Amino acid sequence: MDVRQRTEEIERLTLAPWATFSDASRGRVRPEEQDPIRPVFQRDRDRIIHCKAFRRLKQKTQVFLSPEGDLYRTRLTHTLEVAQIARTIARALRLNEDLTEAISLAHDLGHMPFGHAGESALDKLCPEGFRHYMQSLRVVDKLEKDGRGLNLTWEVRNGIVTHTKGTWAATPEGRIVRMADQIAFVNHDIEDAVRAGVLDPATLPRECTAVLGETKSQRITTMINSILRSSEGDVQVGAEENEAFLALKDFMYRTVYVDRSAKKEEQKVEKVLTELYEYYLTHIEQMSNFYLQLAYQEGRDRAVTDYISGMSDEFAIRTFEDVFVPRKWHVL
């Protein structure tokens, strides 16, 4: 018996009956030999951490576009906070932490530069529309490793495409990530909004803070405890906490996410991405051979969408300047 098999045996002895067991995975698109040390979901987690798309998250916007200061969240810090909350819940419920962490780390790999403003802009441009969760799946299936993809397990791939609105994940670990994503972004967006001066913490709805808590730590702890109390055979949150949380999220959408200063920047985002999109449609030779091949196989729109969606905020701005902003030149 090798290390992996011993780990799988420990899972069978210690995890809850409704957990997703590594040795019962539905497998990968392309079958592979088992690793002698790591179970399948741990291998997925490792592949995600080492992929290029994961590294790009450090320079992609969470909510505030190009904020001044080092303390604001990026898409990477958001991802790590989701993973922390999700793993805490998974461990307490005796579910599969490796699967939970893998889904958490991959759930936003397909996010555009400039956050949801970028997603909205590309959704208008792309004939097929654009949804970051579907792009996240495309990243791990098709775009990483020069077109070979990461060949992740079915369970992780399912968790990626179901972490937001729509169909619930097929595994309890995937459903944990969906809840952890919501808990993380609402609470850290409150903190960032206060730091940015667009939100006074005293204006948070009293009916929400009375249930969830006054601080970020209190609110996260309240939601985690509610899930732990309410989940037996399925992942759920208590009715009172859920109602307060939804009201708090609605408050954030009505106040912070529609802030006028943020909206002005979003107009600039749409212009930058529109100009880049239209430029590369007619100058596909400016993209790498990998994207040229994609254009040949799946069409120019698809290839340009993949190329732009993979850009970091800084790379998109720098590319826009290189293409459209005149440079000084010297005459001898």
Residue ranges and their predicted role:
Residues 1-79, 83-89, 96-97, 118, ...:
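Histidine-centered, transition-metal-coordinating active-site segments
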